[in-house]
Amino acid sequence: MAGTSSQRLAARVREIIARLDAAYGIPQWRPHGDATSELVLTILSQNTSDTNSGRAFARLLRRYPSWDAVAAAPLPELIETIQPGGLAPTKAPRIQAALREIKERTGGYDLSLLKDMPLEEARAWLGGIHGVGPKTVACVLMFALGRPVMPVDTHVFRVASRLGLVPSRAGNAAMTPEKAHFLLESIVPPEGFHAFHLGLIKHGRRTCTAQRPRCPDCPLLDLCPAAARYHPELRPARRRPASARPTR
C-alpha cells in the first residue's frame, strides 16, 4: 500500500508541475552566477522583494570592487549601501561575517569546491556559516552550482501546504519552511526541483496569494483541498441522505 500511495503522490506532483508549466511557461535553467554572489544576494533577498534585493545588490557591486572590500567596509557604510533591501542593520553584519568565514576556510571566495562535494557534505559546509539557513544553502547549491536541492521560500511553503503536499505539523511541532525542504525533496523528482520551485513561486505571487487567493482562476483547483476554505462556493454540494428527502 505504501508503494501505491507514493506512486499516486509522485503522479500528482508531476501533474502539478505540468499544469504550472502550461500556465506560466516552462522555467529555463539559467545559473545566477558564482556561488558567493548567490550567497550574498540570497541574504539580501530575505523578507523583501526581488526588486528591492536586486537594487541593494547592484548598489553593493557598484560601491565595492571586491568581496575583500565588502568584508572590510565600515559597518554603517555597508548598511547605508544595502538599505534598499530592507533590514540592512541585520543583513550587513551577516554578509560580512559570512564573507570573512569563507575567506578563513578557503583562503578566498571561490565556492566551486562545493560543486563536486557529496551533497550532504556541501549542505553542512554552507550551513555551518553563521547566519546561513536552509533556504540560503539550497539557493546557492541549486542556482549557482546546479545541485539537486529544493529551496523553500514563503511562496513555495504556502502553495505546497495548501495543496496538501506539506502537513501542518512535523511530529509535535508546527511545520516550517525550514523543515519542509527535506520533505519536498523526498516527493518531488530531482529533475523537477527547478521547475517545481519556480512554478510554485510564480503561482504564489500571481494566483495562490497569501491573502485572497484567486481559487476560481487556479489551474490546480481540482487538486487543491484548501480551495473551499477560501471560496466556500467551490465546496461540492452534499447530497442529503434518502431519509431526509421530502416524500411526494
Model region roles, listed by residue range:
Residues 3-241:
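Catalytic cores of DNA base-excision repair glycosylases
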Residues 244-248:
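Long, low-complexity, intrinsically disordered segments
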